[in-house]
């Protein structure tokens, strides 16, 4: 369910159509995106916009129930992993719910993206900077 205001019309449209348990992916510049999944390409150049900039805007716009990450982020990108977990903790407090965080292999993560409503590609160029965001409800 849509909660705020996003200037990008494609992102706004996708979020407004999300139902309970639908998923939306925010990814780095290198994640392969299935042809069958809508692509919203925000990448301008390396690092612009960053993964966390996109995650921040998207997650404040929607009700988040869960997040799925690749297990590899823990070892290969620990700083970003901690930043993302901190953001989700703050979001959880703001929303008044518990956001379930789960992990899967990167290979399985790539397969799960095919079931998402859309993949939003950031300009991030650091390893495993990807998250599947699961929509919740505001009631």
Swiss-Prot record:
This protein's record includes keyword Cytoplasm: yes
Reaction(s) catalysed by this chain's protein: beta-D-ribopyranose = beta-D-ribofuranose
Main localization category: cytoplasm
UniProt entry tagged with the keyword Zinc-finger: no
Pfam families with a match to the protein in the record: RbsD_FucU (PF05025)
Subunit-structure text: Homodecamer.
Record family assignment: Belongs to the RbsD / FucU family. RbsD subfamily.
PANTHER family the record matches: D-RIBOSE PYRANASE
Cited function: Catalyzes the interconversion of beta-pyran and beta-furan forms of D-ribose.
Record protein name field: D-ribose pyranase
Lineage: Bacteria, Pseudomonadati, Pseudomonadota, Gammaproteobacteria, Enterobacterales
């Amino acid at each position: 369910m849509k909660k705020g205001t996003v200037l990008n019309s494609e992102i706004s449209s996708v979020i407004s159509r999300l139902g309970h348990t639908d998923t939306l992916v925010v990814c780095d510049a290198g994640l392969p995106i299935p042809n069958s999944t809508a692509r919203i390409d925000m990448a301008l150049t390396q690092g612009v916009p960053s993964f966390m900039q996109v995650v921040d805007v998207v997650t404040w716009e929607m009700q988040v129930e869960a997040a799925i990450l690749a297990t590899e982020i823990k070892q290969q990108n620990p700083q970003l992993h901690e930043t993302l977990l901190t953001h989700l903790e703050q979001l959880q407090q703001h929303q008044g719910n518990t956001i379930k965080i789960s992990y899967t292999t990167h290979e399985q993560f790539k397969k799960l993206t095919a079931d998402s409503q859309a993949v939003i590609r950031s300009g991030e160029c650091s390893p495993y900077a990807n998250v599947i965001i699961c929509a919740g409800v505001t009631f």
